[in-house]
Amino acid sequence: MSAKTSVDTIWHIPDDLWSLIAPLLGPEKQPGTRGRKATPYRLAFDAVVYVLRTGCQWRALPRSEYAPASTIHGIYRKWVKAGVFAKAWKLLLAYYDDKLGIQWKWQALDAAITKAPLGGEATGPSPVDRGKSGTKRSLLTDRRGAPLAMVVTAANTHDKVVALETLDRIIVERPEKLIYRIHHLCLDKGYDYEDVIAGVLARDYILHLKKRGKADKPIDGEKKHPARRWVVERTHSWMNRFRRLLIRWEKQVENYEALLHLACVLILYRLVASAAN
């Protein structure tokens, strides 16, 4: 089975991306063990991407293309427990930084709510869906939309509650603010609270914040430094193209977060590939 050259295809991982991820997965079969031949990890990884991209149930994985669904899901759970997808996200962000450079100067933070009809960890009544079960992802991106940090909470968690936690969850080391290295942070009016503002300023950001009740008025300094709040909204839109993320079916939050992290991996790879083309 040959790998395609772009993540625009549905489920095959490109060779160069696989070469980065494969070392994180460990041996397919423990040395000295007997029994049937192990399922190739590349095949299993492609199957996980298939689920992420198509949104199908695990049991609906085409067996003729991959392996029994129970086998694939077992390998996936093993990787989740080992933190493989979080490590892959961190690795791809470092790869993105090496190829293009993280654009720290302009960052944007916003949250999005997703339906979670089965409930589970980090779910709650959605304020935008008549109190039905939902989950929220709080996301921080750089100027291009590269995902830098993410926090998953219940849908009824106020944005301001997880804003500072999201800033503190950046998965690579953030450069110190210097005179020639200024960081701007763009927020919408949902974050217009004194504790959030104080926390953002304490983290050495120049804040661009739409004020509640003044949404149509320009922010001081925005003619010189126009805010880029739309960037993080676009990344949320990119994530929603992965059909498994449109509705959360995972009860355990670690399983859901792993799929989000894999989406971040593919988004970062696409940003680098697009720049190269």
Which role fits each region the language model picked out?
Residues 1-277:
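Short alpha-helical elements
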